[in-house]
Amino acid sequence: MIAPATLSSRLPLYLRLMRLDKPIGILLLMWPTLWALWLAADGFPPLHLIVIFALGTVLMRSAGCVINDYADRDFDGHVERTRTRPLTTGAVTVREALLLAAGLSLVSFVLILPLDPLVRWLSLPALFLAASYPYTKRFLAIPQAYLGIAFGFGIPMGFAAVQGEVPAIAWLLLLANIFWAVAYDTEYAMVDRPDDLKIGIKTSAITFGRFDVAAVMLCYAVAFGLIAAVGIATGRGPWFFGGIAIAAAIAIYHYTLIRDRDRARCFRAFLHNNWVGAVLFVALVIDYVAFPAA
């Protein structure tokens, strides 16, 4: 057992390992989950489900960050952006990291125990996706697509929690999330591309090569098209489609940031995706208030 004094001194290191000082990953995981809850519940999801999924998102994203740093501990020291991570520098041991990831995953599973059994079953592939994603960068040409599945798995889980099933519309929304994730995480990968080329890991930014900017914009277009299809299928009104238009305008602005492939501006574009997710969520909420489902 870790003594209280020791735990308090190490807590800041654990929080850094969980990336709680950088909440963008939590937000990019949260927005699709909230979209799913609102769509599944026709605009009025139960409060307890919102709380459970919000907490679960924070916990599983944190666990995913710990697992990612464990998997990449031999690479991160060679990348400018990651060389000071606690596991890379040895400030946190491998044993501590694995125990932390296991603890976060366990608490997250306990949260969903009161929910529909299908949610518990879906949590198994969700955990596998979160744990295996870091390793896909070693053999998949576009690991960002795998990330999109992992980051979007709250979508089928949200529908299962509300409806007790996962309808086709949930999988369509998950597909949209995959394209969105490829878009924003390619922007992120453009930041690390010089380092990633040196150490030999695979990313969409490397795979797309000189077509990276075009690929990002195409993925945004497909994602918004699929989200619009979800809106049509669920009978959404002008507020929601107006939100899609605003999100598309943000993506067009991203083009001005990433076209020169400046690392700092690519990172800014990546961070702006929080606003893409937020705009779509707010538009969905307002649309359901203005045009309740029949």
From Swiss-Prot:
UniProt-annotated location(s): Cell inner membrane
Keywords assigned by UniProt, alphabetized: Cell inner membrane, Cell membrane, Magnesium, Membrane, Transferase, Transmembrane, Transmembrane helix, Ubiquinone biosynthesis
Full protein name: 4-hydroxybenzoate octaprenyltransferase
Pathway where this protein functions: Cofactor biosynthesis; ubiquinone biosynthesis
NCBIfam families: ubiA_proteo
Keyword NADP: no
Main location: membrane
EC number: 2.5.1.39
GO BP annotations listed: ubiquinone biosynthetic process
Entry GO CC: plasma membrane
Catalytic activity: all-trans-octaprenyl diphosphate + 4-hydroxybenzoate = 4-hydroxy-3-(all-trans-octaprenyl)benzoate + diphosphate
Entry-linked CDD domains: PT_UbiA_COQ2
